[in-house]
Amino acid sequence: MRSFLVFIFLFFISKPILAEVPKESLKYKRDLIRHSRIIWGLNAPVPLFAAQIHQESSWNHLAKSKYAKGLSQFTGGTAAWIIKIFPELENTNVYNPNWSIRAMLLYDRWLHERISSSGECNQWAMILSSYNGGLTWLERDKEMTKNNNKDPETWWDNVETFSSRSNWAYQENR
């Protein structure tokens, strides 16, 4: 009986807890939606972009990892590179949430235009892997996948299983 009551209690309180939007995300919600729709169109996958920011920095615009900084965790090299591709990002400040959101969305769009895959789910898996590890590594992984008689257009159980990256980079970028 006691186990049943604990189960009922946990069942009813777990749903609201799991369904909560991270409080930290709310201050960026309007900007994320606006920039997403400007860059990706009215059908922009805003929840996917929100999940990406949550994974990258937990909505902390001052976040620092070993190699990257800011809300969308740009490395110094990628931040320097992206302003050459997108001059409108010229006033680089990885700690500025608006800059960081726009840079992430533009980079995702740039990757989306260059990656071929067998469907939207595979496409986004490859985009997100490339976001963290670079497009060159994805292209190498796809070539290795093809050389092993697997499908280079499918991420799951195919491209995701092949890489010549070092162990730490493989873990970081998968």
Where are these regions (language model features)?
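Positively charged n-region of N-terminal signal peptides that target proteins for export
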Residues: 1-4
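Non-catalytic cell-wall polysaccharide-engagement segments
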Residues: 19-31, 38-40, 77-174
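N-terminal targeting signals for Sec/Tat export/insertion, comprising classic cleavable signal peptides
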Residues: 27-50, 64-68
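Short, functionally critical alpha-helical segments immediately adjacent to catalytic or ligand/cofactor-binding
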Residues: 43-60, 104-105, 127-132
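Short, surface-exposed helix-loop/turn micro-motifs enriched in polar/charged residues
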Residues: 44-45, 63-66, 71, 92, ...
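Cell-wall polysaccharide-cleaving catalytic domain and substrate-binding groove, primarily
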Residues: 54-78, 84, 134
